[in-house]
Amino acid sequence: MTDKTTRLGRLTLPIERGIDEEVRALVERLGADAVRNSDGTELPEWVDRAFAKVYSTYFPARGDEEWADQSEGERIHQYLSSNAHTAPESGPLSIDVMEGWFQAQFRPDTQCDTSRWWQVIDRTSGEVVDPSQWSVEAVPAKPIVDPVPIVGDLPKNAGSAVVTIHSPEPFHVYTVSFFAVQVWDSTQMYNYLTNDWALEEGRVKERPFDVAFPRTWEHVKDALAIWLKANPQVDVVRFTTFFYHFTLAFDSRGRERYVDWFGYSASVSIPAMEEFEKEYGYALTPEDFVDGGWYNCPFRTPTPVFKDWIDFTSKRVAEKAGELVRKVHEEGREAMMFLGDNWIGMEPYGPYFPSIKMDAVVGSVGSAATCRMISDIPGVRYTEGRFLPYFFPDVFREGGDPLGEANESWRTARRAIVRSPLDRMGYGGYLSLALKFPEFIDRVEEILGEFRSLHEATGGEKPACAPVRVAVLNAWGKLRTWQTHMVAHALWYKQIHTYLGVIEALAGLPFDVRFMSFDEVIEGEMKALEDVDVVINAGAANTSFSGGQVWEDLRLQDALRRFVARGGGFIGVGQPTASVGTQGNADRGGICRGSVFTLSDVLGVDQEISWSLSKDHYEEPVSEHFITADLDGDYIFGEDPGDVVVTDSATRVLVMDRGSVRASAHDFCAGRSVYLAGLTWSTVNSRLLHRAIMWAAHAEDQWESVLSSSNPDVEVAWYPESALAFVYNDADAPRSSEISGQGGQILVELAAGQGRWVDWEKGQLL
């Protein structure tokens, strides 16, 4: 066999026991220089670093069932809300808090001081019910009725609780915010149910434990030291991940009920909350986490309390993760983090992440945006993308389409990789399943060749960007770089696709992009905008992404108006800057701005919410404009954001639909603004945003500065130092395009999904 050092490299392959010859052959064929196990598989005993670089998954806070038995009171906890119940006209109200929740995943913690760590709230009046007015009774868990997946037996320590409100207000609505013990690890539960592990003898339901408890933390450190000594063949410890899982809660039938990839709900514990009170000077309440049942989802503008909790959790997680990483380094190994699962508190763009000294980050690549989320992480030596499909039986089965998913995954991710290359790519799951689909393996081999060429053809040079700097403005800013409008990682949701297309497009466009928070602008005023040419505010009204009430801050309004007036560009998508202020007469102490979009004067349009129907509006669409030059056919913007009308006769209406403005352009003093109703992902919409940014920045004459493609389905990247261009077809069908710029022009014809290099000086395809 060829020595691993002579292989092509940049590939991590999942392997398993029982297919030794197949593993050896495929590693050689694909040029894999690293191998890994996955959740549910083990590395063959013969694999060592002479064969390939060895990754091994490591779970600091689960998988040790012996310790789980010894630390029963030190489980991961999570705040949950009961279903809402309406009180009867007379008599008490009893609420089974686990109604609707998965009895195999959670158990109410009735051993804690429930008067302190539980809350009963009258949701009608907004009042917290005094603990003396209600009582808690622990009751047995109810059996799971009609489960959707195969669950198997309930964990031995499953249970429920009934809260009785003795004298509720008649017909008021009540909820119970309760402290729940997690009796089954979220990731292992997901994999267990997805793969029908209940049918496999010996599979256990793993219980997670919390490093906030000193005894458990000492055990976790000792266990890692022992494991490192016992596994000298492992080169890279792939932490999957560290301590706290994103919010993932199932319903009573074993289906997903609440998923928030950014959720901090499972990072709570009594020791942590007590430490928080000492450090920040105030006590947390259950409602700080339950948040009326919204659980501080990232679409909510984060409260000051929740920001404090994120900061506190990130700081303590970074300190502990850093200790484990130091142990790995002391043994001469590398530390890699999986960006997912138990990643809460490991914010890779947060202030504490660099202190951990992580060598690498690997994450699942579900879109161009999630690819950039990984590849742009600062302070690590290398990044790796785990590509789809995952080698699980939900795809690798009769009737499944792993080849189609591989093509879609590559076309999607390639746009981001071209702009900000991942250092490595890999896959996960059961290799034995993938081997049953030889055409899939053939395609992976082709994808690998193209991926490697993006590193090798230009000697590591990155493609040139257009001379326009873009800032995406929302409540989260840098902390959630490339992470806006996501619920469950890269999954499609009706309410978000209209806006997710903005960062999906930006992830593959030739711009320098940064993410900026409202606070950054408010506190820094114009200084925050000094290095920016175009600001984008995209989102639905009253969300953290559009801004909501934050636009009542005059400092924010003033900074943006000054920025545009002095020549900057502003692009609003959906319901940008939407906030109706405080209703009331300005003479009576209210703020009656008379508009929904706070910056309607800048945008030249506003939203009609039936308050100004008596006003007549005369929209006259223009037939041609730089922004819509490549819009062939209808503008498919996504979900309807509501009626939008012009507020200035100088506003150029680019697209009208059913009497509403869907795209417009407007001059504001020396600057320019653009309004778009939405931007669901498509190559045409990506081109529309590309042109909108260039126009808003007064940079139309720079359109070909980094080469341009006549066909939106075909993109091009320009490498000036190498005098090379890379052209790539984003469509699943053949496409042709004229590539122009830098004094040259060439016609390219590409097969479905194909990428080709061009020697620009010679005008030849390579």
Feature locations, PLM:
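Hydrophobic targeting/anchoring helices
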Residues: 65, 224-225, 238-242, 246-250, ...
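Extracellular ligand-binding/catalytic regions of CAZymes and related secreted enzymes
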Residues: 248-251, 432-464, 507, 594-613, ...
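Polysaccharide-binding and catalytic clefts of secreted carbohydrate-active enzymes
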Residues: 75-355, 373
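Noncatalytic N-terminal accessory/assembly modules of large enzymes
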Residues: 3-62, 66-94, 102
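Catalytic domains of carbohydrate-active enzymes, especially glycoside hydrolases
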Residues: 18-51, 223-240, 360-361, 412-422, ...
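The substrate-binding groove and active-site-proximal loops of carbohydrate-active enzymes
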Residues: 9-17, 32-36, 196-218, 300-318, ...
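A short, well-structured beta->alpha microelement
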Residues: 12-24, 38-40, 337-346, 503-528
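A glycine-rich, often tryptophan-bearing local segment used as a flexible ligand/cofactor-contacting loop or short
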Residues: 547-631
